[in-house]
């Protein structure tokens, strides 16, 4: 969890003589000289290069963990992942040239994608601030309404997709690419192989086979024993979307003709990363326009942007009610809303995308002065007072700092 900008370990700011104030704020000024910029700032890489170079193996944007980690074996659900050894005689392999990233021209993929992997749990590093990130668009593969409906049902029931917002969910559905399986006995994935793809079954059936050795062996029984099966609407290989852990089972087609939908890990992670990065940048821009928060440093705005919770309200619903305690601040991310006061006919104020309300709740818990009602379907970003104080300390301290910076105490 991010440290507070005003740790409790520090001595509280004393309100005494002018010399006391000057000394205290001089200390703040000196500390701010070494602050980092927001990761969404275009100068982030150069501004923090020196700090990054002083630490080897940093996890930020390209650092790595566990370079010397050994192989890991999984003996759990067959819906898992992994590297290739020998194939069972008489079984066809799913054509490797068909299993490539679905992004246009593999744009932005690491050079060593899916090459020479060891059987460790890891994932590629992606940098949202790298060149070309702003121009990247998720791949799109056309589907019928019936196909979209079935895929939506299949994806919605999977734990990996339960947290996606509407835009991310749509991008995932659009990125799924159709993979025909033309015959019976084709191995879609092999136990022990590195996993790169998640699959949804459109039609046909597939068996899950596990060999005690952890990989496919030569011979007629090289795939091991059947431990389960999946049919239309089912899915497998979801852990491949998180990291390239070894596949825990072999999946082989049962019917003469089947169809799968596939999504590769790089595209999935890029969708999540790009969406989160753009949302953070938007939130930071919103926060700059809030007078109460205008004195925040870039890294402080980044903290707040990450702490905002997105909430949806249907048209006509009440977001905050007049007279209720003020405990949260809201940014209107999309849609329109109106403010109403008891005894006043019609709205007293209207809000659109980029507007905010409830900011005084960050200062105290006085009752709300008006009700805010959604005029259309809206999406708001919510920040509670407790969350704000946990990240940055009391707003009063920030306002005091802003007052000093605009009117410094003379030496």
Swiss-Prot record:
Matching InterPro entries: cAMP-dep_PK_reg_su-like, cAMP_dep_PK_reg_su, cNMP-bd_CS, cNMP-bd_dom, cNMP-bd_dom_sf, RmlC-like_jellyroll
Keyword Nucleotide-binding among UniProt keywords: yes
Key words of the record: cAMP, cAMP-binding, Nucleotide-binding, Phosphoprotein, Repeat
Region feature Dimerization and phosphorylation, mapped onto this chain: 23-159
Segments for region (Disordered): 1-144
Biased composition (Polar residues): 119-136
Phosphoserine: residues bearing it: 120
Subunit structure: Tetramer, composed of 2 regulatory (R) and 2 catalytic (C) subunits. In the presence of cAMP it dissociates into 2 active monomeric C subunits and an R dimer.
UniProt name for this protein: cAMP-dependent protein kinase regulatory subunit
Source organism of this protein record: Aspergillus niger
Source taxonomy: Eukaryota, Fungi, Dikarya, Ascomycota, Pezizomycotina
């Amino acid at each position: 969890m991010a440290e507070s900008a005003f740790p409790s370990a520090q001595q509280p700011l004393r309100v005494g003589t002018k010399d006391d104030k000057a000394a205290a704020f001089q200390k703040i000024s000196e500390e701010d000289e070494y602050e980092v910029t927001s990761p969404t700032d275009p100068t982030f890489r150069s501004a923090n290069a020196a700090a990054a170079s002083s630490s080897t193996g940093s996890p930020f944007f390209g650092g790595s963990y566990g370079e010397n980690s050994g192989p890991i074996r999984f003996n759990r659900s067959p819906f898992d992942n992994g590297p290739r050894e020998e194939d069972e005689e008489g079984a066809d392999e799913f054509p490797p040239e068909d299993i490539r990233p679905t992004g246009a021209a593999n744009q932005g993929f690491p050079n060593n994608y899916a090459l020479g992997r060891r059987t460790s749990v890891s994932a590629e590093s992606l940098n949202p601030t790298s060149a070309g990130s702003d121009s990247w668009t998720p791949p799109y593969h056309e589907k019928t309404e019936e196909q979209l409906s079935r895929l939506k049902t299949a994806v919605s029931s999977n734990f990996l997709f339960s947290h996606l917002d509407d835009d991310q969910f749509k991008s995932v559905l659009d990125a799924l690419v159709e993979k025909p399986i033309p015959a019976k006995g084709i191995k879609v994935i092999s136990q022990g192989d590195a996993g790169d793809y998640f699959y949804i079954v459109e039609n046909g059936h597939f068996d899950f086979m596990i060999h005690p050795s952890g990989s496919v062996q030569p011979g007629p029984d090289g795939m091991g024993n059947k431990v389960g099966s999946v049919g239309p609407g089912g899915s497998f290989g979801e852990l491949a979307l998180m990291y390239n852990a070894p596949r825990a089972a072999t999946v082989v087609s049962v019917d003469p003709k089947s169809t799968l939908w596939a999504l590769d890990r790089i595209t999935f992670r890029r969708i999540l990363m790009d969406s989160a990065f753009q949302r953070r940048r938007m939130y930071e821009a919103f926060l700059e326009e809030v007078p109460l928060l205008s004195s925040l440093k870039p890294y402080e705005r980044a903290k707040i942007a990450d702490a905002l919770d997105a909430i949806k309200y249907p048209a006509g619903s009440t977001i905050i009610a007049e007279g209720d305690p003020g405990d949260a601040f809201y940014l209107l991310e999309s849609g329109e809303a109106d403010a109403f006061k008891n005894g006043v006919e019609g709205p007293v104020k209207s809000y659109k995308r980029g507007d905010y309300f409830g900011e005084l709740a960050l200062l105290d818990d006085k009752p709300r002065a008006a009700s805010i009602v959604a005029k259309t379907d809206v999406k708001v970003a919510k920040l509670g007072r407790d969350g704000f104080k946990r990240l940055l300390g009391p707003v009063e301290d920030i306002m005091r700092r802003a007052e000093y910076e605009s009117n410094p105490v003379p030496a």
